[in-house]
Amino acid sequence: MSEKEKSSTTTSSVIDEFGFPAEVIQILDRTGVTGEVTQVRVRVLEGRDKGRILTRNVKGPVRLGDILILRETEREARKLSTKR
């Protein structure tokens, strides 16, 4: 088995076991009753949706450039709206 085949099977097993890696490219806003959730834009790094940009809600501390592991890439967070 060549090095390229080994790395591709390793990558696919990581995706199957854990999820899809995505890099935080923009922090949008805080949401939740007490502001405990941060809405961010992420770029999917591997998998069938490689390069796709999603809006997701993240609980816990997050910074630009962080790598998140997404269990799936189909769902996207709703846009925040102000209620008056």
Curated annotation (Swiss-Prot):
<dbReference type="GO" id="GO:0006412">
    <property type="term" value="P:translation"/>
</dbReference>
<dbReference type="GO" id="GO:0003735">
    <property type="term" value="F:structural constituent of ribosome"/>
</dbReference>
<dbReference type="InterPro" id="IPR028626">
    <property type="entry name" value="Ribosomal_eS28_CS"/>
</dbReference>
<dbReference type="Pfam" id="PF01200">
    <property type="entry name" value="Ribosomal_S28e"/>
</dbReference>
<protein>
    <recommendedName>
        <fullName>Small ribosomal subunit protein eS28</fullName>
    </recommendedName>
</protein>
<dbReference type="InterPro" id="IPR000289">
    <property type="entry name" value="Ribosomal_eS28"/>
</dbReference>
<keyword id="KW-0689">Ribosomal protein</keyword>
<dbReference type="GO" id="GO:0030490">
    <property type="term" value="P:maturation of SSU-rRNA"/>
</dbReference>
<comment type="similarity">
    <text>Belongs to the eukaryotic ribosomal protein eS28 family.</text>
</comment>
<dbReference type="GO" id="GO:0022627">
    <property type="term" value="C:cytosolic small ribosomal subunit"/>
</dbReference>
<dbReference type="GO" id="GO:0000028">
    <property type="term" value="P:ribosomal small subunit assembly"/>
</dbReference>
<dbReference type="InterPro" id="IPR012340">
    <property type="entry name" value="NA-bd_OB-fold"/>
</dbReference>
<keyword id="KW-0687">Ribonucleoprotein</keyword>
